[in-house]
């Protein structure tokens, strides 16, 4: 999906349509990119409390559509320390839990987001343990717990030849 910077309403509608489509095909989980709700690069918008609150409202709207399907939605999220890049894990019951990016590695992000979160979290869906990792935190993971069945990396990094191969090699 192609998300537009600052167009929370349109981005949310795209996400909801994709959730409805995945649900109609019997999917248990659907995942979206880092900053899917806000679009990226959002830079200066991430310093606006109103913008961050609108993103949180959008995640709540998306959660209402997640009855019977889980979703992982990339969004900025305002914490007590400041805005973070997060993945909103929305359960099949519509409950929201935010998983935040731990490291701010790109200079272009510095000053807009803080990196003080846990960085990754294991969730369980239909008996499968899935590790959800936000942003470039995947490049700092040394090893995975053997109980993890799959990794979902919510990342908005630009395409670069060989990047995926290097990431897999690190894991």
Regions found by a protein language model. Give the residues of each.
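Enzyme catalytic cores with a strong preference for nitrogen-chemistry domains
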Residues: 1-171
């Amino acid at each position: 999906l192609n998300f537009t910077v600052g167009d929370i309403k349109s981005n949310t509608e795209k996400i909801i349509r994709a959730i409805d489509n995945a649900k109609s095909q019997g999917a248990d989980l659907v995942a979206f990119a880092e900053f899917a709700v806000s679009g990226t690069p959002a830079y200066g918008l991430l310093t606006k409390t109103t913008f961050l609150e609108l993103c949180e409202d959008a995640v709540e709207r998306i959660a209402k559509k997640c009855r019977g399907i889980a979703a992982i939605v990339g969004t900025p999220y305002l914490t007590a320390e400041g805005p973070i890049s997060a993945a909103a894990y929305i359960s099949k019951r519509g409950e929201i839990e935010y998983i935040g990016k731990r490291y701010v590695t790109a200079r272009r992000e510095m000053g807009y987001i803080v990196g003080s979160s846990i960085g990754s979290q294991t969730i369980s869906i239909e008996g499968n343990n899935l590790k959800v990792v936000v942003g470039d935190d995947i490049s700092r993971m040394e090893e995975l717990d053997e109980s993890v069945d799959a990794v979902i990396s919510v990342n908005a990094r630009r395409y670069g030849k060989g990047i995926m191969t290097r990431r897999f090699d690190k894991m």
